[in-house]
Swiss-Prot record:
FAD binds at residues 14-19, 126, 181, 370. One of its GO terms (biological process) is tRNA methylation. One of its GO terms (cellular component) is cytosol. The keyword Cytoplasm applies. It is found in: Cytoplasm. Belongs to the MnmG family. NAD(+) binds at residues 273-287. NAD-binding protein involved in the addition of a carboxymethylaminomethyl (cmnm) group at the wobble position (U34) of certain tRNAs, forming tRNA-cmnm(5)s(2)U34. Pfam families: GIDA, GIDA_C_1st, SAM_GIDA_C. The keyword Repeat does not apply. This is tRNA uridine 5-carboxymethylaminomethyl modification enzyme MnmG. One of its GO terms (molecular function) is flavin adenine dinucleotide binding. Keywords: Cytoplasm, FAD, Flavoprotein, NAD, tRNA processing.
Length: 629
């Protein structure tokens, strides 16, 4: 027998990285929000790698922060180490990566959620949605509680019909031996959603006291203070190193001899695994010419001896895992504390979503995170933030927010999912972004703070600091463009000392900065600014001047693309009425139902000829008959 448990503007199912961002965003925007999760002790839990950031993913964390999300602030308070990656490469691929104290990360984020006005956190398992006339009206829990809501966001991670697999051992479970969500998965199928079966995995954890670190290579954090959040002013300087070692020929021999016992190769696993995070069995089989593979030993926190063995994700049986660990230099006498495992779970086919992450089948229902077919905490958090924003906008009667591919990696991620779909766990890569020179780590605030402020997630105080930073950047660029540096002896000496060609004539300071060997600090020595500028402002001035030509080229590409994005396609267009479309294109267009010509052009199976035909119909006003007429 059910009972009425309350009414809310937004209900979030799940409290992982997607759920936390969704719940916090909705509540901070003024929506009365309820977060329901199976286990309150597992809020913001990191079931796999104890880290945040990395290539592309680190930029997503910066974008989350620029929009007013929480992940960046939280990892800045709880990391044990932070490093800037790809510093020897161009600014487009630089990214921050933090090693997390996973327990502090959980504790801090749960505390933030508990202290947030408008936000209620409750332990309960959702089994069904309340759906009336094609609209989601609320949820029903295992205990019979009926909660009504204007909007619902599902962020169930890998819990949907989750199964843990090690060798020939297989049992129903969520990550880390949590209770799985079985009934909700079945209910989504009843509602007509297409689900797919995906797989991911995690490596064993070992006892730090039993590692011989003298046989490994130290991997320290950066000496320079780093932060994901643009608001962070206090930095953690007491960092803990990670350690690098390698598999051995003995490791590979042991794996080869036990492949028949791996769930990956015995046929036990049916789900599709992540291409960019393969198991150690996969690496040994697919790259059998490599004598060794990197293994990083990553502490899971400051107050635990557990160490995450990155690079050794596996579904081999427990006894093989133990023996395999002891073939690795430094781990000869190691004690395993937790076994690695593979986990299979249900995910929704993401082409069933609008770019707002609302489902097409059921109005007011949103999904975010691994349920949408992605992998990674950062991808989940970015989706959770956008789903929470849009669910709140709907509940408050405001216009929903869609980030374009030119705006953010989050925009690339969501557009890829809803337009192209994915047949494997999707991981964000810099190569997926065609405008990656515009989507940099350093300029996330310049790209997205206006959006965050407009929707109410950025405070006035922070917005004022942001506008002041923008003003300083423009003023310094103008100053350097107006100053002529003459070939004085001290100028020529500095240029010679850094390996440059001496000046023949006077040159604008901005033009001198464009030289590859010159930095802003060199220019500052020659023509110092009267105003004290932050490192962030100096960095922006240097990047914007040095890469001006390339940035301008990218902006021109964006403008051309926007012409296609601005050509809207009616939501209720009937593609069956456009007889000249190729049959594959017609089916794909019906499945995805793109909102613009730009989105239509990115659908696999829709070729330029189909786009031209569709364009004629749209531009001439010959809209195909509407299905419901």
């Amino acid at each position: 027998m059910g009972y009425n448990a309350g009414s809310y503007d937004v209900i979030v199912i799940g409290a992982g990285h997607a759920g936390c961002e969704a719940g916090l965003a909705a509540a901070r925007m003024g929506s009365k929000t309820l977060m329901l999760t199976i286990n309150l002790d597992m809020v913001a839990f990191m079931p796999c790698n104890p880290s945040v950031g990395g290539p592309a993913k680190g930029i997503v964390v910066r974008e989350i922060d620029a929009l007013g999300g929480e992940m960046g602030r939280n990892i800045d308070k709880t990391h044990i180490q932070m490093r800037m990656l790809n510093t020897g490469k161009g600014p487009a691929v630089r990214a921050l990566r933090a090693q997390a104290d996973k327990f502090s990360y959980q504790h801090e984020l749960k505390k933030t959620i508990e202290e947030t006005p408008n936000l209620t956190l409750f332990q309960g398992m959702v089994e069904r949605l309340i759906v009336e006339d094609g609209e989601c009206k609320g949820v029903i829990t295992q205990a019979g509680a009926e909660y009504t809501a204007k909007t619902v966001v599902i962020t169930t991670g890998t819990f949907l019909r989750g199964e843990i697999i090690m060798g020939d051992l297989k049992y129903s479970s969520g990550p880390n031996n949590q209770q799985p969500s079985i009934t909700l998965s079945e209910h989504l199928e009843e509602l007509g959603f297409d689900l797919v079966r995906f797989k991911t995995g995690t490596p064993p954890r070992v006892n730090s006291n039993t590692i011989d670190y003298s046989k490994t290579e130290i991997q320290p954090g950066d000496d320079k203070p780093r932060a994901f959040s643009f608001e962070t002013t206090k930095f953690i300087m007491d960092q803990i190193p990670c350690w690098l070692t390698y598999t051995s020929t003995e490791t590979h021999r042991l794996i080869d001899e036990n492949l028949h016992r791996s769930a990956m190769y015995s046929g036990m696993i049916k789900g599709t695994g992540p291409r960019y995070c393969p198991s150690i069995e996969d690496k040994v089989v697919r790259f059998n010419d490599k004598p060794r593979h990197q293994i990083f030993l990553e502490p899971e926190g400051r107050n635990t001896q557990e160490v995450y063995v990155q690079g050794l994700s596996t579904s081999l049986p427990e006894d093989v895992q133990r023996d395999m660990l002891r073939t690795i230099p430094g781990l000869e006498n190691v004690e395993m504390m937790r076994t690695g495992y593979a986990i299979e779970y249900d995910a929704i086919v993401p082409t069933q979503l609008w770019p707002t992450l609302e489902t097409k089948k059921i109005k007011n229902l949103y999904t975010a995170g691994q349920i949408n077919g992605t992998s990674g905490y950062e991808e989940a958090a970015g989706q959770g933030l956008m789903a929470g924003i849009n669910a709140a906008c709907r509940s408050l009667g405001k216009k929903e927010v869609i980030l374009g591919r030119e705006d953010a990696y989050i925009g690339v991620l969501i557009d890829d999912l809803v337009t192209k779909g994915t047949n494997e766990p999707y991981r964000l890569l810099t190569s997926r972004a065609e405008y990656r020179l515009l989507l940099r780590h350093d300029n996330a605030d310049l790209r997205l703070t206006e959006v965050g402020h407009e929707i109410g997630l950025i405070t006035e105080e922070r917005y004022e600091r942001f506008t002041n930073k923008k003003l300083q950047i423009e003023q310094e660029k103008e100053r350097l463009s107006s100053i002529i540096i003459k070939p004085r002896p001290e100028v020529q000496e500095l240029i010679r000392n850094i390996g440059g060609s001496e000046l023949k004539d006077g040159i604008r300071a901005s033009d001198l900065l464009r030289r590859p060997e010159m930095t802003y600090e060199h220019i500052h020595l020659l023509v110092p600014s009267e105003v004290e500028l932050s490192d962030e402002v100096k960095e922006q001035v240097e990047i914007q001047i040095k890469y001006e030509g390339y940035i301008e080229k990218s902006l021109q590409q964006v403008e051309r693309m926007k012409k296609m994005e601005n050509k809207k396609i009616p939501v209720d267009i009937d593609y069956d009425a456009i007889s000249s479309l190729a049959s594959e294109a017609r089916q794909k267009l019906k499945d995805v139902r793109p909102l613009s010509m730009g989105q239509a052009s990115r659908i696999s199976g829709v070729n330029p000829a189909d786009i031209s035909i569709l364009l004629v119909y749209i531009e001439q006003g010959k809209i195909a008959r509407v299905s419901n007429q």
